[in-house]
């Protein structure tokens, strides 16, 4: 009977341990990048991201988040946000994104010459006037790290790769 109890306890603990499986979703360099991001957000260095940490981090980026916005962000986590929870949340978000070919094909609809690029002014117009409209500030933020050549061509193939795999392979 005690062996049955042990199995029952193990089964009950499984959901808590399942978060550690998130480490298998990312390679070592990605985990290191997430750790660096976590440490930048964890302003008070207590090993947890709290509402004040989020506020300070966003303020350092020139944002002035409301309490409601911060509460909504904090409520996305089922409990305290330590590094494992942070990684789990990112894993869930990344798994929730569309497959790479779906994203690339969405951009390709606006690339009539099949060059793999879209003129940045045309893409800005599309993003600010169609569907879930972006603000000019949101487009500016997107373009800040986007692969745009000197002629103003947004490379959506490279952008999609960065979106799904990160910028780490850029030098490879």
From Swiss-Prot:
Subunit-level organization: Myosin is a hexamer of 2 heavy chains and 4 light chains: interacts with myosin heavy chain MYO19. Interacts with LUZP1; the interaction results in inhibition of phosphorylation of MYL9 by DAPK3.
GO cellular component labels: actomyosin; cell cortex; cytoplasm; myosin II complex; myosin II filament
EF-hand domain boundaries: 29-64, 98-133, 134-169
Stretches the record annotates as Disordered: 1-20
Record-listed Phosphothreonine modification sites: 19
Protein known as: Myosin regulatory light polypeptide 9
PTMs per UniProt: Phosphorylation increases the actin-activated myosin ATPase activity and thereby regulates the contractile activity. It is required to generate the driving force in the migration of the cells but not necessary for localization of myosin-2 at the leading edge. Phosphorylation is required for myotube formation. Phosphorylated by DAPK3; DAPK3-mediated phosphorylation is inhibited by LUZP1.
Disulfide bonds: none
Subcellular location as annotated: Cytoplasm, Cytoskeleton; Cytoplasm, Cell cortex
Positions contributing to Ca(2+) binding: 42, 44, 46, 53
């Amino acid at each position: 009977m005690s062996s049955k109890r042990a199995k029952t306890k193990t089964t009950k603990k499984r959901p808590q341990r399942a978060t550690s499986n998130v480490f298998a979703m990312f390679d070592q360099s990605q985990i290191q990048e997430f750790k660096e991001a976590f440490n930048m957000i964890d302003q008070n260095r207590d090993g947890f991201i709290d509402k004040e940490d989020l506020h300070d981090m966003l303020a350092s980026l020139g944002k002035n988040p409301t309490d409601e916005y911060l509460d909504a962000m904090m409520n996305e986590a089922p409990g305290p946000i330590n590094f494992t929870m942070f990684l789990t949340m990112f894993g869930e978000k990344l798994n929730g994104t569309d497959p790479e070919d779906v994203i690339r094909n969405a951009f390709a609809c606006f690339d009539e010459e099949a060059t793999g690029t879209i003129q940045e002014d045309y893409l800005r117009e599309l993003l600010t006037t169609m569907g879930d409209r972006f603000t000019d500030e949101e487009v500016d933020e997107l373009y800040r790290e986007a692969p745009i050549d000197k002629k103003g061509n947004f490379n959506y193939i490279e952008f999609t790769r960065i979106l799904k795999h990160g910028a780490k392979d850029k030098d490879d």
